[in-house]
């Protein structure tokens, strides 16, 4: 299964934890980060296969900030943790930029919070930015914006953020690099009978028991959060691999189809998962009616919806809201995320994209709903 899941993945999110990035808190591990960046660059260029799109989610800002500030122990005050994050993020971003530049690869820093992905408009903006960076061949390096959040520092984790990013960009796979070789049936440090888990279904409830539960020593060490992250990633059709981050050429070997670490398989196909999410779980905020030609293009060709094909707009919605697309007879044929608010959409009906800047005062996306953010209902 690993051979097909990772070998065939074209968009991959890689998450690496702070213990690896900072060499157990001793400072940024320049050699390790350089190795991961070398592998990321090789994947983007298609070394040994097809080019991949890769996003790195990296912890380590707080740990690096503590080192730079001369703090030997993690402070308990939130504002001190936030200060450490602000100091450390400078070094973290600089290190990735330097190591990727050594590979002649562009990089971009993106700081996110859970709130950014909970708000539909900010979600859509973040998605558009990341997809543009990937299209440009740039490696986005994402971290949680610890300087402005509170609960995430106290209880959150970048395993969850990695899964949310996988959802956001519709990744094919999530790779979590950790200081453990993968998942065991019990804590191998305490139970000599513990068996290594090579593969399981991401939604298997028994996995959480294997990880020890949230209150166990292993759970506090992070394995439980990785199991939950894999379950979340599976919701959008992405399978997850948990592997030792210091395994030589771990990313390249996974991409070649080698069996390394634990594979947690998503039971839902990526497109099916997105359809279910779009159709069943998001509330409609309005609708647009299109002419017969636009309806045919959506139904038959899966094209994006352009405003020139719209004849009417109903409801009051904002950018990022879910809207229905109706044919001239009023039948709902698709739904998706709106690139324009309802007031703007009314101005754009029957207009070509060349007129958008004159009408709106700014130039934005040429589509009302991009095909990547749309589900054609007849194709369910």
UniProtKB/Swiss-Prot annotation:
CDD domains: AAK_G5K_ProB, PUA_G5K. It is an enzyme of class 2 (transferase). Substrate binds at residues 59, 146, 158. Its EC number is 2.7.2.11. One of its GO terms (cellular component) is cytosol. One of its GO terms (molecular function) is glutamate 5-kinase activity. PROSITE patterns: GLUTAMATE_5_KINASE (PS00902), PUA (PS50890). One of its GO terms (biological process) is L-proline biosynthetic process. The keyword Kinase applies. It catalyses: L-glutamate + ATP = L-glutamyl 5-phosphate + ADP. Catalyzes the transfer of a phosphate group to glutamate to form L-glutamate 5-phosphate. This is Glutamate 5-kinase. It comes from Acidovorax sp. (strain JS42). The lineage of its organism: Bacteria, Pseudomonadati, Pseudomonadota, Betaproteobacteria, Burkholderiales.
């Amino acid at each position: 299964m690993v051979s097909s899941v990772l070998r065939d993945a074209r968009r991959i999110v890689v998450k690496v934890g702070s213990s690896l990035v900072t060499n157990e808190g001793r400072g940024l591990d320049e050699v390790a980060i350089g190795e991961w960046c070398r592998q990321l660059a090789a994947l983007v260029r298609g070394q040994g296969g097809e080019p991949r799109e890769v996003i790195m989610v990296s912890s380590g800002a707080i740990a690096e900030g503590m080192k730079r500030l001369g703090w030997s122990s993690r402070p308990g005050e939130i504002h001190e943790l936030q200060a450490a994050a602000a100091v450390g993020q400078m070094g973290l971003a600089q290190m990735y930029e330097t190591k990727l530049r050594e590979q002649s690869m562009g990089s971009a820093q993106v700081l996110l919070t859970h709130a950014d992905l909970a708000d539909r408009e900010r979600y859509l903006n973040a998605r558009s930015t990341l997809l543009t960076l990937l299209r440009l061949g740039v490696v986005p390096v994402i971290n949680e914006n610890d300087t402005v959040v509170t609960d995430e520092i106290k209880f959150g984790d970048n395993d969850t953020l990695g899964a949310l990013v996988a959802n956001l960009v519709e990744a094919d796979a999530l790779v979590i690099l950790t200081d453990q070789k993968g998942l065991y049936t019990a804590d191998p440090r305490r139970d000599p009978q513990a068996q290594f888990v090579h593969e399981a279904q991401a939604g298997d409830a028994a996995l959480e028991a294997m990880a020890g539960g949230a209150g166990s020593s292993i759970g506090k060490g992070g394995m439980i959060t990785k199991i939950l992250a894999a379950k979340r990633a599976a919701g959008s059709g992405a399978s997850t691999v948990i592997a030792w981050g210091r395994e030589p050429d771990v990313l390249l070997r996974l991409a070649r189809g080698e069996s390394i670490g634990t594979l947690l398989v998503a039971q839902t196909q990526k497109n099916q998962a997105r359809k279910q999410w779009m159709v069943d779980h998001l509330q409609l905020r309005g609708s647009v009616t299109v002419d017969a030609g636009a309806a045919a293009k959506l139904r038959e060709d899966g094209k994006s919806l352009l405003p020139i094909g719209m004849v009417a707009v109903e409801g009051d919605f904002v950018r990022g809201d879910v809207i229905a697309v109706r044919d001239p007879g009023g039948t709902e044929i698709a739904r998706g995320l709106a690139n324009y608010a309802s007031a703007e959409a009314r101005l754009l009906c029957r207009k070509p994209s060349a007129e958008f800047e004159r009408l709106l005062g700014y130039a934005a996306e040429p589509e009302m709903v991009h095909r990547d953010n749309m589900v054609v209902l007849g194709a369910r």
